[in-house]
Curated annotation (Swiss-Prot):
Coiled coil: none
Function: Acts as an atypical protein-lysine deacetylase in vitro. Catalyzes the deacetylation of lysine residues using CoA as substrate, generating acetyl-CoA and the free amine of protein-lysine residues. Additional experiments are however required to confirm the protein-lysine deacetylase activity in vivo. Has hydrolase activity towards various surrogate p-nitrophenyl (pNp) substrates, such as pNp-butyrate, pNp-acetate and pNp-octanoate in vitro, with a strong preference for pNp-acetate. May activate transcription.
Descriptive protein name: Putative protein-lysine deacylase ABHD14B
Signal peptide: none
One Pfam family in the UniProt entry: Abhydrolase_6
Family in the record: Belongs to the AB hydrolase superfamily. ABHD14 family.
Subcellular location as annotated: Cytoplasm; Nucleus
Annotated catalytic residues: 111, 162, 188
SUPFAM superfamilies per the UniProt record, alphabetical: alpha/beta-Hydrolases
Quaternary structure (record): May interact with TAF1.
Length: 210
């Protein structure tokens, strides 16, 4: 098993302290690129640690960073830049990326985190290498023209038992460069219901971006 280096810490973003967990390849192994993992309202960076996603990504050669979003997890004291369900400024996630020095990256965005990732995705200056939405909210708040301009390779993931996954897909399918992974028998946090299928699909997608 490949050696993996684990760490955690905080970054300052617009005067707010945000907690993060990180896993990267050990033994001085070169990093392919960075993957930023966001989370839903009932979850946190700990979800990705416990599921093994951080470890699996680092084993495969990626720098994996999971943050606790403002007001949640160990970032509970941080004020969110927008009310839940409203689009946050794209510059907020850009500031997170800068503070973590992630460079060209892939963003994994389940559920609640759509309010942060979608504005970042459609920003003209976006440096996203790849986008992995998992039944995110706010997909109806992006217009068709903005979706059509996005060239970022996208893996749309959702469980077939999740109505939000189906409804968000109706908007996300407007992204020109997308593929779809539907997990049979899985609900809203489909990655928890089908972790092996999640990790296989994610790693296959990332491999093609290298």
């Amino acid at each position: 098993m490949a050696n993996v280096e684990l760490s955690e810490g905080t970054i300052q973003v617009r005067g707010q302290s945000l907690f993060f967990r990180e896993a990267r390849p050990g033994n001085g192994q070169a990093v392919r690129f960075s993957v930023l993992l966001l989370h839903g309202i009932r979850f946190s960076s700990e979800t990705w640690q416990n599921l093994g996603t951080l470890h699996r990504l680092a084993e495969a050669g990626y720098r994996a960073v999971a943050i606790d979003l403002p007001g949640l997890g160990r970032s509970k004291e941080a004020a969110a830049p927008a009310p839940i369900g409203e689009l946050a400024p794209g510059s907020f996630l850009a500031a997170v990326v800068d503070a973590l020095e992630l460079g060209s990256l892939v963003v994994i965005s389940p559920s609640l985190s759509g309010m942060y990732a979608l504005p970042f995705l459609v920003a003209p200056e976006s440096q996203l290498r790849g986008y992995v939405p998992v039944a995110p909210i706010c997909t109806d708040k992006i217009n068709a023209a903005d979706y059509a301009r996005v060239k970022t390779p996208t893996l749309i993931v959702y469980g077939d038992q999740d109505p939000m996954g189906s409804s968000s897909f109706q908007h996300l399918k407007q992204l020109p460069n997308h593929r779809v992974l539907v997990m049979e028998g899985a609900g809203h946090p489909c990655y928890l219901d089908k972790p092996d299928e999640w990790h296989t699909g994610l790693l296959d997608f990332l491999q093609e971006l290298a």
